[in-house]
Amino acid sequence: MAADTLVVQEVSPRDGLQIEPKWVETADKIALIDSLSQLGFTRIEAGSFVSPKAIPALRDGDEVFRGIRRAPGVTYVALIPNAKGAERALAARADELNLVMSASQTHNRANMRMSCENSLAGFGDIVGLVQGARVSLNCTVATAFGCPFEGRIDENRVLHLVDAYRELGIGGITLADTTGMANPRQVTRLVARVLDLVPASALTLHFHDTRGLGLANVLAAYEAGARRFDASLGGLGGCPFAPGASGNICTEDLVNLCDEMEIPNTIDLARLLPLSRTLPALVGHEVPGQVAKAGRNTDLHPAPAYVAEIA
């Protein structure tokens, strides 16, 4: 893969569906993941292993992971909150475990029901648990750019957490703009500082389009050296424990941006759009994505018949 390739990690099966009030059948989740696996994605966040009381929409994570047809070259990621979740994910043969902790103490207490210090201690237990297993670890720094309870987050706080995760032996880092509070200048600055600590291959950016800056933030991060980005088909998703955390950046809109700007990527947009157009029937409402509605710039329309008659 070329060094300038933008890698899209598809998160709709997990982050996209976790706040949906309508139950999506297990077979439909599996079918969605299997379809995504054929469209050029190399990474898919396929589900989570959290308490069904906390996230009832994803209570079938075990069945989903056991039911998918694993495509060669695709890494299937599971979000886990604790060691119990890690044990379930290992049993279900997840390829990568994604741990989550907030840069904000208040949000971490709301989301994880514990302090940041206790979360970090628990991560050490998980690192020990997976030793010897053929699984990689990633840690998401939630509210890395801003918190709906505390406001702007000190960049040094984020860098401290990145250092702490790396010292534990966690290989991957995600910076998450959990409630869409980031702006491009802020993104450029923080990404550059984090890339002084970790290689681009270990860094993922997770943006929300809550305030309309999602794709602008992607472009800022890409130009600062980041290469991997979370995105959700149709723009589905949000955090149930963060006020105002509307949808993730839309996968097809991001791929369209890449194609229009000739940024290398691996996703087949022409085949992705029909899949996105099935989402309203799946979740029972319209979805935020734009390109699935408008079509690509190359999808031209016939001119009105009268045009040919005008001199």
Language-model-detected regions and their locations in the chain:
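Catalytic cores and adjacent flexible loops of soluble metabolic enzymes
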Residues: 1-311
